[in-house]
Amino acid sequence: MAPNIRKSHPLLKMINNSLIDLPSPSNISAWWNFGSLLGICLMTQILTGLLLATHYTADTTLAFSSVAHTCRNVQYGWLIRNLHANGASFFFICIYLHIGRGFYYGSYLYKETWNTGVILLLTLMATAFVGYVLPWGQMSFWGATVITNLFSAIPYIGQTLVEWAWGGFSVDNPTLTRFFALHFLLPFMIAGLTTIHLTFLHESGSNNPLGITSNCDKIPFHPYFTLKDILGFTLMLLPLTILALFSPNLLGDPENFTPANPLITPPHIKPEWYFLFAYAILRSIPNKLGGVLALAASVLILFLTPFLHKAKQRTMTFRPISQLLFWILVTNLLILTWVGSQPVEHPFIIIGQLASITYFTILLILFPITGALENKMLNY
């Protein structure tokens, strides 16, 4: 019998082993769809971003008007821009749900896959930040000023580091130029890291909702999960299209319709919604360096989760106390997101501080204790 080209060709063989004949657990739920959704987000963002870059000018005098020109005069430029801007929001929705799934089902015990995933999150956050600066509106400019300024809190080298990042003594033309270069480069880095992420995942195979080995019951990825993924794509791309067509500015800041002006500070400087939880943690500490450390810790804490797993069971499926704690953590993050969008005034300051303390307490103290407690209750 002639060999199947899908299984013998050096390149097709790799695609076959990761997308067609990949042995997958038969019981993985819709929570396992977000990986492929993130892949679609990345592809959409690179495509729309490339089309936008062909019409964009990375110069302080022209950036704002070049974006306006794209929306007004380029064929479907408005649609490309709206898909790109809102695509970022969907990217973050998917990655947060993907991380939440990994946390709930103990997927972090695949340490290499988890760590590359956290690096991917950090790279995505960096990409979104530099991208937000490019339209050169008021919030772009002041957001860049505030966030880059945080590096000056680093002892001894801080100020030098900030001026080096700016390419001068303030956020100006050199800053915009290098941010555009970074925004163009980083998505391709994300694509490269994604292949590493998948390589590590395919070493162990997928986890599943029961957290037990699924070697005794595997099914091929195609046609079962290819079809399931395509359903996921339509369920994500439909709301994205609706948002981009009907209310494209819903998630944006009205301040960004005003061109950047270093002489006028907006009344409330705040980042896009997907950074608000971290921004709230940053603001909740009165000390600059302390705030920066808390901000970094809020994301870097994810690297510690594999070491804080004390339960004998992998997933939270049969651990009700941990489940309760997990949903309290989710609620807490929503509270932080809301507080981050509010002005720095009386009730919000204390709410933010309490929510920040709760966030770290749950992750660092309560989860390991609960895991150990459940072991005792189950007589492990």
UniProtKB/Swiss-Prot annotation:
Belongs to the cytochrome b family. Heme b b566 binds at H98, H197. GO terms for biological process: mitochondrial electron transport, ubiquinol to cytochrome c. One of its GO terms (molecular function) is ubiquinol-cytochrome-c reductase activity. It is found in: Mitochondrion inner membrane. It comes from the Eukaryota. GO terms for cellular component: mitochondrial inner membrane; respiratory chain complex III. This is Cytochrome b. Its main location: mitochondrion. The chain crosses the membrane at residues 34-54, 78-99, 114-134, 179-199, 227-247, 289-309, 321-341, 348-368. Heme b b562 binds at H84, H183. The cytochrome bc1 complex contains 11 subunits: 3 respiratory subunits (MT-CYB, CYC1 and UQCRFS1), 2 core proteins (UQCRC1 and UQCRC2) and 6 low-molecular weight proteins (UQCRH/QCR6, UQCRB/QCR7, UQCRQ/QCR8, UQCR10/QCR9, UQCR11/QCR10 and a cleavage product of UQCRFS1). This cytochrome bc1 complex then forms a dimer. Disulfide bonds: none annotated. It comes from Pelecanoides magellani (Magellanic diving petrel). Its cofactor is heme b. Pfam families: Cytochrom_B_C (PF00032), Cytochrome_B (PF00033). Heme 1 (or BL or b562) is low-potential and absorbs at about 562 nm, and heme 2 (or BH or b566) is high-potential and absorbs at about 566 nm.
